[in-house]
Amino acid sequence: MVRMNVLADALKSINNAEKRGKRQVLLRPCSKVIVRFLTVMMKHGYIGEFEIIDDHRAGKIVVNLTGRLNKCGVISPRFDVQLKDLEKWQNNLLPSRQFGFIVLTTSAGIMDHEEARRKHTGGKILGFFF
């Protein structure tokens, strides 16, 4: 069966494994967008290390979970977000101002909303985690 949205599948797998209390989760297929999204999550300490396994096909990723993640999800379609509209999306998607991040894809790469605000750039919303 053809996968329509590999990022959505990966984030849902992480979400389900986290709810079940698993220590690791296997994601396949691997893509650059998933790797960048996981890097942002790891930078903020919501997941542990992850390892990319090259099987000469689509690839796999093994993610170590820390138990800190409450929810992660994808926003589809990928809405355009200007810098001034970021506050509105933050209020809609995140539970509070203290924690949680929206992940954007911008011309400067894939980053969280705080880094996008610092770099003064908008982009398209990929997803969120808290």
Swiss-Prot record:
Task: List GO terms (cellular component aspect).
Answer: cytosolic small ribosomal subunit; nucleolus; small-subunit processome
Keyword Phosphoprotein on entry: no
Extract the Pfam families matched here: Ribosomal_S8
Q: Where in the cell is it found?
A: Cytoplasm; Nucleus, Nucleolus
The record's principal subcellular location, in a coarse class, is cytoplasm
Knockout: what is the outcome? Answer: Morpholino-injected embryos have a thin yolk sac, bent tail, and show a marked decrease of erythrocyte production.
Q: Which PROSITE patterns match?
A: RIBOSOMAL_S8
Protein's GO biological process: brain development; chordate embryonic development; erythrocyte differentiation; regulation of cell cycle; ribosomal small subunit biogenesis; translation
Q: Does Nucleus show up as a keyword for this record?
A: yes
Q: Which UniProt keywords apply?
A: Cytoplasm, Nucleus, Ribonucleoprotein, Ribosomal protein
In terms of domain of life, where is this protein from?
Eukaryota
Q: Name one GO molecular function term.
A: structural constituent of ribosome
> What does the subunit section of this Swiss-Prot or TrEMBL entry state?
Component of the 40S ribosomal subunit. Part of the small subunit (SSU) processome, composed of more than 70 proteins and the RNA chaperone small nucleolar RNA (snoRNA) U3.
Q: What does this protein do?
A: Component of the small ribosomal subunit. Part of the small subunit (SSU) processome, first precursor of the small eukaryotic ribosomal subunit. During the assembly of the SSU processome in the nucleolus, many ribosome biogenesis factors, an RNA chaperone and ribosomal proteins associate with the nascent pre-rRNA and work in concert to generate RNA folding, modifications, rearrangements and cleavage as well as targeted degradation of pre-ribosomal RNA by the RNA exosome. Required for erythropoiesis during embryonic development.
The similarity comment for this entry is: Belongs to the universal ribosomal protein uS8 family.
Name-wise, this protein is Small ribosomal subunit protein uS8
Q: Which gene encodes it?
A: rps15a
